[in-house]
């Protein structure tokens, strides 16, 4: 497929960190996306953005579009409006991305022009029993196919993360209408479903996407984990992470003030992150150094309180990395860890 027939679009925001994330996303496409760098690139916003932001994106070859919000009850659903661009943009496949994704390699050869492409999610808050109830509520037949979630390997229906979507042009208009419709219906009825109410308004647009795909009987092709690799969680051993070399990573806003993607649990993936050159080298980024230290000592990513506190000490040179390591070793959390 020729890159000029691919449109890459994201739903941005005038607020940080989303504005900067939008810039990083398109910078990654231009730097590492190969043929994708020549694709049509559009950033959508549901509120006015600064001239500086528009200018920065234009320099990257990105057009900006102002879109109407879907519903004030769920700002995450505004991403659905990306699909409303089909009448003004010429493409064979729409690649819809969240702002907190980064392109590491050219994936154009893996785009299917005839099926919707998406990666199954790492978690499913609903579970099979609640999906049955939800499908019955909307008069839909529960799909027979079963997936396993990547984090805990629980069995569920084909339920997708919508941070990375490949949508063939013939499907875009109809999917847009159905996805939007199920979103509004879910927002109107969510209180009837305790498990949905528990997380409201999160996941609404993701549940509605799954309802739309199955309710609209669209052909879909599950993408591999390499096409939307989450860096914020530890995944099940069946995922065989050591064999993975991702095309796109989904950092879930885990990005340093200097523009470096924070580490995940897997060294082979972190080595891929080391190759991203947007700003200060990761080895000189205080937040990344603290994140590394947490992983080495506490075996988890740094929480925001610890990250901000220790990186500030490091940056101001009030404490060295060795000093901070000693502080962590003296903590109750470290002392409570099982010793190997």
Describe the function of each predicted region.
Residues 163-170:
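Short glycine- and hydrophobic/aromatic-rich loop-to-beta-strand nucleating segment
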Residues 99-101:
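Short acidic donor-binding/metal-coordinating loop in glycosyltransferase active sites
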Residues 1-71, 89-90, 200, 275-279:
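N-terminal anchoring/stem segment of glycosyltransferases
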Residues 2-3, 152-155, 173-283:
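A glycosyltransferase accessory/donor-loop signature
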Residues 282-340:
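Composition-driven recognition of low-complexity segments enriched
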Residues 94:
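Short aromatic/hydrophobic "clamp" motif used to bind/position activated sugar donors
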Residues 71-78:
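A short, glycine-/small-residue-rich helix N-cap motif at loop->alpha-helix starts
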Residues 103-139:
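Conserved donor-nucleotide/metal-binding helix-loop-beta segment in metal-dependent transferases, i.e.
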């Amino acid at each position: 497929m020729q890159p000029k027939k691919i449109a890459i679009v994201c739903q941005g925001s005038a607020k940080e960190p989303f504005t900067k994330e939008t810039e990083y996303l398109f910078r990654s496409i231009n730097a590492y996306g190969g043929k994708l760098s020549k694709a049509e690139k559009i950033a959508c916003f549901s509120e006015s953005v600064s001239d500086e932001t528009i200018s920065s994106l234009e320099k990257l070859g990105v057009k900006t579009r102002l879109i109407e919000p879907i519903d004030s009850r769920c700002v995450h659903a505004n991403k659905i409006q990306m699909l409303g661009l089909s009448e003004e943009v010429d493409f064979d496949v729409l690649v819809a991305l969240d702002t907190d994704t980064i392109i590491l390699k050219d994936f154009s050869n893996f785009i299917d022009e005839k099926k919707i492409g998406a990666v199954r999610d790492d978690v499913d808050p609903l579970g099979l029993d609640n999906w049955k109830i939800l499908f019955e509520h909307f008069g839909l037949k529960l799909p027979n196919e079963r997936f396993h979630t990547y984090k805990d390997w629980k069995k569920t229906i084909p339920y997708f993360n919508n941070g990375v979507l490949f949508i063939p042009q013939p499907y875009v208009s109809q999917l847009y209408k159905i996805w939007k419709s199920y979103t509004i219906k879910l927002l109107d009825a969510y209180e009837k479903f305790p498990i949905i109410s528990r997380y409201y308004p999160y996941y609404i647009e993701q549940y509605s996407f799954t309802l739309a795909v199955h309710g609209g009987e669209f052909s879909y092709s599950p993408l591999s984990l390499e096409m939307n690799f989450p860096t914020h969680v530890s995944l099940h051993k069946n995922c065989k992470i050591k064999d993975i070399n991702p095309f796109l990573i989904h950092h879930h806003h885990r990005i340093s003030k200097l523009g470096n993607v924070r580490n995940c649990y897997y060294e082979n993936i972190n080595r891929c992150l080391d190759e991203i050159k947007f700003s200060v080298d990761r080895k000189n980024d205080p937040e990344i150094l603290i994140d590394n230290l947490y992983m080495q000592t506490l075996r988890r990513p740094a929480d925001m309180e610890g990250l901000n506190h220790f990186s500030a000490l490091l940056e101001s040179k009030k404490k060295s990395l060795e000093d901070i390591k000693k502080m962590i070793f003296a903590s109750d959390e470290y002392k409570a860890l099982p010793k190997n």
